[in-house]
Amino acid sequence: MPHIDNDVKLDFKDVLLRPKRSTLKSRSEVDLTRSFSFRNSKQTYSGVPIIAANMDTVGTFEMAKVLCKFSLFTAVHKHYSLVQWQEFAGQNPDCLEHLAASSGTGSSDFEQLEQILEAIPQVKYICLDVANGYSEHFVEFVKDVRKRFPQHTIMAGNVVTGEMVEELILSGADIIKVGIGPGSVCTTRKKTGVGYPQLSAVMECADAAHGLKGHIISDGGCSCPGDVAKAFGAGADFVMLGGMLAGHSESGGELIERDGKKYKLFYGMSSEMAMKKYAGGVAEYRASEGKTVEVPFKGDVEHTIRDILGGIRSTCTYVGAAKLKELSRRTTFIRVTQQVNPIFSEAC
C-alpha cells in the first residue's frame, strides 16, 4: 500500500542559519580541524573534514596534492592503476594519511583495492561507493571488506535514512555517505523519482550514526560555501564536494577552448560519458543517471579552497562557534522562501 510521509523535508536552499551572540573577535580565531575516533577500525582522524569526491574529474592525485596542504581529504577515484598509486605514494608520502582508496562492489574493483592497500600500507581509508546503498548485496560486501581489512577506516554509501545508516555501521562501516540524487551532475531523481532532501537526510542520518558512535559524510548538494556550513550545522562530520571542486587545473576532465574561453568537462560517474569510458557504454538494461557539463575553467583550486574555508569560518563567527566542532550545537535553522537578493547575483 503506498504511503505518504507528511513530515516536511528540507534542502539547503530552504533554510538560513540564525545569527547568535559571539565572543569571537575575528574569523582567524576559528579552528576548523576536527578529531575523530572511529567505531569499527579503532583508528583516529585529525584534519579539516572536507573531502574531494571520488569522481575521476575531482578525486585526482593532483587534487590530493593541494588539498593535503590544507589538511583536507581526497577520496581518490577507483580508475588509477596500481603503478600510478605507487608512483604517487613514492613522490607524496605526506599526503597518504589524507587519502582514501575507492572501490565498487565488483570483483575486479576489490582485487585492485587489495593490491593498492597491500602495496601502500600508509593508506588507511577505504571508500566503498555504490549508487544504491540499500541492497543486501552491498551490506554483505561491507561485511566482507571489514573482515578483510579489520584496521582500515571504511566509508560506505550512499543512503539517506537512519535505519540504513545503522545497518551499515553495524556491518562494519565507520563513516556513512549520505545523499541520493543531490549532486550537480546527478540525474537519479529525474530518472527514477527517488531521493531525499539533503538537509533533512543529513540531520536524520547524523542522529542515527552518532547514537552508535559512527560518523557521516554529507555527499552532494553543496553549491556554495554557505551550503557546506549548513551541512556541518546539520550534524555532518564530513562534507564531500564534487561540482564545487570541478573545473580547476587539478581537476580531471578534458580542457576545451571555445571562442577564447576555456572549459573543463565534468560528468557524473553514472553518466553516459563515464560508462562509455569505463564500461564500453550504457548497458541495455539500465539508463544513464548522470549528465555531462562544461564548467568554466577556474584555474588553481587553492583559491576555491580558501574561499570555502573562509566562508565556514565566517559562519562560525556569526553563530558564536570557536571551533567547527561547536557549529552544530550553535545551529538554529530558520525556514525561508528566499536566501539572496537576485538582482545582480547568481543562484548562490
Curated annotation (Swiss-Prot):
Changing C186A: Loss of enzyme activity. Changing T188A: Loss of enzyme activity. NADP(+) binds at residues 26-27, 78, 129-131, 180-181, 269, 285-286, 314-317. It comes from Homo sapiens. Homotetramer. Highly expressed in heart, skeletal muscle, kidney, brain, liver, prostate, spleen, placenta, testis and ovary. Low expression in colon, thymus and peripheral blood leukocytes. GO terms for biological process: GMP metabolic process; purine nucleobase metabolic process. Keywords: Acetylation, Metal-binding, NADP, Oxidoreductase, Potassium, Purine metabolism. It catalyses: IMP + NH4(+) + NADP(+) = GMP + NADPH + 2 H(+). InterPro entries: Aldolase_TIM, GMP_reductase, GMPR, IMP_DH/GMP_Rdtase_CS, IMP_DH_GMPRt. The modification N6-acetyllysine is found at K291. The active site is at C186 (thioimidate intermediate), T188 (proton donor/acceptor). K(+) binds at G181, G183, C186, R189. Belongs to the IMPDH/GMPR family. GuaC type 1 subfamily. GO terms for cellular component: cytosol; GMP reductase complex. HAMAP family: GMP_reduct_type1. GMP binds at D219, G220, G221, G242, G243, G268, M269, S270, R286, A287, S288, E289, G290. It is an enzyme of class 1 (oxidoreductase). Catalyzes the irreversible NADPH-dependent deamination of GMP to IMP. It functions in the conversion of nucleobase, nucleoside and nucleotide derivatives of G to A nucleotides, and in maintaining the intracellular balance of A and G nucleotides. Plays a role in modulating cellular differentiation. Its EC number is 1.7.1.7. GO terms for molecular function: GMP reductase activity; metal ion binding. This is GMP reductase 2.
